[in-house]
């Protein structure tokens, strides 16, 4: 997620972008001295900044380890890592129409592509690489980076909103099907055909997220009060949660837990909501024996005579757990992870911090802040809540994509790049001898990083 402000300035820690890896991946050969044994589950965070990009690993609450830093490319506005491999896709503000695919462990550039307009988002899984422009989407084969398909003339999408499932069998892409209402277009990236159009919301979409299995899709609109979950590819509404009633907010991110049991939603407010995806078993009706019981039965029966909007509110789920962030107005991205066998909520924010909260999977309630780590390169780590005064700033609700669409701060080349072929993406020179038969999804060729303990 891009963390730049509306004016294009980086956050307090000079951050431009932050994103968690697609899943919690086992790192082979981790040191016993580090308390990780031979195999350990490590959560990874990619950060782009004015000075380059970095990768952090998080195997415990107390330690955020920087495993890689690159300062060769400045103003990195997009940095997407393929799970915990060494493959990374990079876009810079200085060349916003150019995508570079690199092997960061070797320090080599594998290939690059130039597009006709600003790149607003890049998504990766082990089958496909997706490049999102304002009015088109490019589907690349991750094995050789060839363009397989182009979705043209999509509704204007200045925020670059899209989501890609990480599941190989359910490899779906979701993106807005309308610029005026909350329709979701679901596209099968393996068979290269449209799968479904889901009428998710009345207002335009603001956030999308697949679960790990690729069978559920969470959606939120610009209004930000209701979160919905649909089955994929059928498009049946499975869950509906109400984030709030009093005010409309800008949803920053949605994230499922790896088991698909929880869904988190962060916004431009100080509250992160966590919903539990469980179907309540219907109990057989019982005759009420008290006055309050009779009153409740009459109340539920009366809902059938109320307007549909009011009836829906009675049936919407509420947050299972909440998190109170020490700031309001910063762009942020959340993730639900299991670290040291305990469910945690992780929040990376434009103020330059990573916040870690404990989640009680049985009781829920308000989550406790366990740790916060600096992401700007310093070694500062603290348990204390930052002074709220240091977080006071105008609300930041516009993404890099939205700003780019309005031409507010993204540099553009003097001449517009024209399409040179029917696919619309210009491939640069491959810089590896074996690029003609790249196997970018193979860990043997692009192995995970090994945690260093020296």
UniProtKB/Swiss-Prot annotation:
Subcellular location(s) of the protein: Preautophagosomal structure membrane
Residues modified to Phosphoserine: 413
Pfam family for this entry, one: PROPPIN
Domain of life: Eukaryota
WD repeat ranges, renumbered to this chain: 15-60, 67-104, 110-142, 149-189, 193-232, 238-277, 320-359
Keyword annotations of the record: Autophagy, Disease variant, Intellectual disability, Lipid-binding, Membrane, Phosphoprotein, Repeat, WD repeat
UniProt note on tissues of expression: Ubiquitously expressed (at protein level). Highly expressed in heart, skeletal muscle and pancreas. Expression is down-regulated in pancreatic and in kidney tumors.
Result after altering residue 242 to T: Impairs preautophagosomal localization
Motif L/FRRG motif, chain ranges: 241-244
Effect on the protein of changing residue 143 to E: Decreasess interaction with ATG16L1
GO biological process, one term: autophagosome assembly
Broad class of where this protein is predominantly found: membrane
Reported impact of residue 249 to M: In IDDSSA; altered autophagosome assembly shown in patient cells
One annotated GO molecular function: phosphatidylinositol-3,5-bisphosphate binding
Disease linkage: Intellectual developmental disorder with short stature and variable skeletal anomalies: An autosomal recessive disorder characterized by severe intellectual disability, speech and language impairment, developmental delay, and cardiac, thyroid and skeletal abnormalities. Skeletal features include short stature, camptodactyly, fifth finger clinodactyly, thumb hypoplasia, overlapping toes, and kyphosis or lumbar vertebral abnormalities.
Comment text on domains: The L/FRRG motif is required for recruitment to PtdIns3P.
Family: Belongs to the WD repeat PROPPIN family.
Role of this protein: Component of the autophagy machinery that controls the major intracellular degradation process by which cytoplasmic materials are packaged into autophagosomes and delivered to lysosomes for degradation. Involved in an early step of the formation of preautophagosomal structures. Binds and is activated by phosphatidylinositol 3-phosphate (PtdIns3P) forming on membranes of the endoplasmic reticulum upon activation of the upstream ULK1 and PI3 kinases. Mediates ER-isolation membranes contacts by interacting with the ULK1:RB1CC1 complex and PtdIns3P.
Subunit structure: Interacts with TECPR1. Interacts with ATG16L1. Interacts with ATG5. Interacts with WIPI1. Interacts with WDR45. May interact with NUDC. Interacts with ULK1 and RB1CC1.
Protein name: WD repeat domain phosphoinositide-interacting protein 2
Organism expressing this protein natively: Homo sapiens
Gene this chain is encoded by: WIPI2
């Amino acid at each position: 997620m891009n963390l730049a402000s509306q004016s294009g300035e980086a956050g307090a820690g000079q951050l431009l972008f932050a994103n968690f890896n697609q899943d919690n991946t086992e790192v082979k050969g981790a040191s016993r001295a580090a308390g990780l044994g031979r195999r350990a589950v490590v959560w990874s965070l990619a950060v782009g900044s004015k000075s380059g990009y970095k990768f952090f690993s998080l195997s415990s609450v107390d330690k955020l380890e920087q495993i890689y830093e690159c300062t060769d490319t400045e103003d990195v506005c997009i940095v997407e890592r393929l799970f915990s491999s060494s493959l990374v896709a990079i876009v810079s503000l200085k060349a916003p129409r150019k995508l570079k695919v690199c092997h960061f462990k070797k320090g080599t550039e594998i290939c690059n592509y130039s597009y006709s307009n600003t790149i607003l988002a890049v998504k990766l899984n082990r089958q496909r690489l997706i490049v999102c422009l304002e009015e088109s989407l490019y589907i690349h084969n991750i094995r050789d980076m060839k363009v397989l398909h182009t979705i043209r003339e999509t509704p204007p999408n200045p925020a670059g909103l899209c989501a890609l499932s990480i599941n190989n069998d359910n490899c779906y892409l979701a993106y807005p099907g309308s610029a005026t209402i909350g329709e979701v277009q679901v596209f099968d990236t393996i068979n290269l055909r449209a799968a479904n159009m889901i009428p998710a919301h009345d207002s335009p979409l603001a956030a999308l997220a697949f679960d790990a299995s690729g069978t559920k899709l969470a959606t939120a609109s610009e209004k930000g009060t209701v979160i919905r979950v649909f089955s994929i590819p059928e498009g049946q509404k499975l869950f509906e949660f109400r984030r709030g009633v009093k005010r409309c907010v800008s949803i920053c991110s949605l994230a499922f837990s790896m088991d698909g049991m929880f869904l988190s939603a962060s916004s431009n407010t100080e509250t992160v909501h966590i919903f539990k995806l469980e179907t309540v078993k219907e109990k057989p009706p019982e005759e009420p024996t008290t006055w309050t019981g009779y009153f409740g039965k009459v109340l539920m029966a009366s809902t059938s005579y109320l307007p549909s909007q009011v009836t829906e509110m009675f049936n919407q789920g509420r947050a299972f757990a909440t998190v109170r962030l020490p700031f309001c107005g910063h762009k942020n991205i959340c993730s639900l992870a299991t670290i040291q066998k305990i469910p945690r909520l992780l929040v990376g924010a434009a103020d330059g911090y990573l916040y870690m909260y404990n989640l009680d999977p049985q009781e829920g309630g308000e989550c406790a802040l366990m740790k916060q780590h600096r992401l700007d390169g310093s070694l500062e780590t603290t348990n204390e809540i930052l002074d709220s005064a240091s977080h006071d700033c105008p609300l930041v609700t516009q993404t890099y994509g939205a700003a780019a669409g309005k031409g507010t701060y993204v540099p553009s080349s003097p001449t517009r790049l024209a399409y040179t072929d029917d696919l619309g993406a210009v491939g640069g020179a491959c810089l590896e001898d074996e690029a003609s038969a790249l196997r970018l999804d193979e860990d043997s060729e692009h192995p995970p990083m090994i945690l260093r303990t020296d």
